[in-house]
Amino acid sequence: MIRQFGPAEALFIIEAVRWTVLLSVVAFIGGGIGGLGVALARTAPSAWLRDIAAGYIQLFQGTPLLMQLFLVFFGCTVLGAGIDPLAAAAIALTLNAAAFLGEIWRGCIQAVPVGQWEAATALGMRHLSRMRYVIVPQAGKVGIAPTVGFLVQLVKSTSLASIIGFVEITRAGQIINNVTFRPFEVFGLVAVIYFMLCWPLSHLSQRLERRYGTVSR
């Protein structure tokens, strides 16, 4: 039976925002922790650490996020470990985010002027101390804007979780469209919600880039 697209249907989609936000936050925090490790490994003195981190980045940047979602969700099932769509989506997005954030932050670390590295070395600092007290604090300022910009992409990427059955905004829209057959109204609302989530972040990223876009020499 075909239903009308009314307030109740719109509310169902709007309520799914909490799951999109939850998934985005979990993936961003987890990806941030992993990304920091990847960035530090990419700039480590050890060649084998750099190679492992580079391989990780190439693996996740070189394959579609959709395939990564499939592999985590169905791979766990094949291995006999049942996993719900939220957990599968969180794992896949976290691993993906770690690769992208790691590369973003690697660029920020290497953007710190050579003079800062040389000054820290001249003071007798070891690599970890040099990174902790001199390099990372400066790289962090440069990295704020692109990190917020990546968060915008991450929020939009959560829509792919609908393919494994996780009911976020896009999946909620699909469910309502299947019973109302009003795709323009349904997905128009979905698009508006994504815009309302992402536009403030995009605006914030631009402001932060203007403020912290350079490293002092």
Where are these regions (language model features)?
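Transmembrane alpha-helices and adjacent helix-loop boundaries
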Residues: 1-217
